[in-house]
From Swiss-Prot:
<dbReference type="GO" id="GO:0050916">
    <property type="term" value="P:sensory perception of sweet taste"/>
</dbReference>
<keyword id="KW-0342">GTP-binding</keyword>
<dbReference type="GO" id="GO:0005737">
    <property type="term" value="C:cytoplasm"/>
</dbReference>
<dbReference type="GO" id="GO:0007507">
    <property type="term" value="P:heart development"/>
</dbReference>
<feature type="binding site">
    <location>
        <begin position="40"/>
        <end position="47"/>
    </location>
    <ligand>
        <name>GTP</name>
    </ligand>
</feature>
<dbReference type="Pfam" id="PF00503">
    <property type="entry name" value="G-alpha"/>
</dbReference>
<feature type="binding site">
    <location>
        <begin position="201"/>
        <end position="205"/>
    </location>
    <ligand>
        <name>GTP</name>
    </ligand>
</feature>
<dbReference type="GO" id="GO:0007186">
    <property type="term" value="P:G protein-coupled receptor signaling pathway"/>
</dbReference>
<feature type="region of interest" description="G1 motif">
    <location>
        <begin position="35"/>
        <end position="48"/>
    </location>
</feature>
<dbReference type="GO" id="GO:0005834">
    <property type="term" value="C:heterotrimeric G-protein complex"/>
</dbReference>
<feature type="binding site">
    <location>
        <position position="182"/>
    </location>
    <ligand>
        <name>Mg(2+)</name>
    </ligand>
</feature>
<keyword id="KW-0449">Lipoprotein</keyword>
<feature type="binding site">
    <location>
        <begin position="270"/>
        <end position="273"/>
    </location>
    <ligand>
        <name>GTP</name>
    </ligand>
</feature>
<keyword id="KW-0547">Nucleotide-binding</keyword>
<feature type="binding site">
    <location>
        <begin position="176"/>
        <end position="182"/>
    </location>
    <ligand>
        <name>GTP</name>
    </ligand>
</feature>
<feature type="region of interest" description="G5 motif">
    <location>
        <begin position="324"/>
        <end position="329"/>
    </location>
</feature>
<keyword id="KW-0479">Metal-binding</keyword>
Amino acid sequence: MGCAQSAEERAAAARSRLIERNLKEDGIQAAKDIKLLLLGAGESGKSTIVKQMKIIHESGFTAEDFKQYRPVVYSNTIQSLVAILRAMPTLSIQYSNNERESDAKMVFDVCQRMHDTEPFSEELLAAMKRLWQDAGVQECFSRSNEYQLNDSAKYFLDDLDRLGAKDYQPTEQDILRTRVKTTGIVEVHFSFKNLNFKLFDVGGQRSERKKWIHCFEDVTAIIFCVAMSEYDQVLHEDETTNRMQESLKLFDSICNNKWFTDTSIILFLNKKDLFEEKIRKSPLTICFPEYTGGQEYGEAAAYIQAQFEAKNKSTSKEIYCHMTCATDTNNIQFVFDAVTDVIIANNLRGCGLY
């Protein structure tokens, strides 16, 4: 009887060990499948992060991608110039030379006829170059926080000769700088450090937000993007709400959302290069009237970080913050490496394997 019982006990113990081993293997496998949700207000750099993942973790852009982005570069460039020209009368800025009026008319005509995605004609290229060199246009550009303008405007308009060449082909950096509004959900899959990543980018504009929250309650982590440089700008959607205040509000609603109680949150304070330039001449008090610090990058950036971290109401949830420049591949590679290490540690801890 004793022998029979010990045989049963041994069999039960063996079964128990097998179940535990299977559970552990399942846990390890589950810990290898990483779902990341990329969130943030419109134009915070989410789509650029997705493009960087293609460059860093996939085989980069295809020949077809380069071909498809060529008209986008043309359109982004001419539409940026149009945005500046349209703002001039609103800001009571004159051209330094009256002849620029006819150049501006040519640029407006091209956009009106919806030819903005086509290569620049020689006449159009010459007109755009004259306009961009005009002192009045440059003055209006320097006040771009007072109207809506793509971040990449200067990047493209400073390089009109290259973009206007007959044999122009976009570079990787050109593609990273392009702006196309994201609608719906963009999904990217890649492997890194023996993990299988699924990255979801969701349209940032207000009208899109209600579509995603409940669908992603099982994500491993949220990467929340904030454009640091937008502290002195207002929204496209209503032109009265400060963009950074809107970002803070959205971060609050995500960070403390019931669906994401146990979800790691990684905060990308993005566009640090533009912020570093801007903070010298545009005070942070535009967004945070109570700020008493200096007009200096380190102090101002730390203050912005503290405002976002203060929104976290959970004592058990940590916010992992990084200052980023989404158009800088080396910077994003370095930051994503650090992010992955945090995810690995958290995931293994969650499975009881760390």
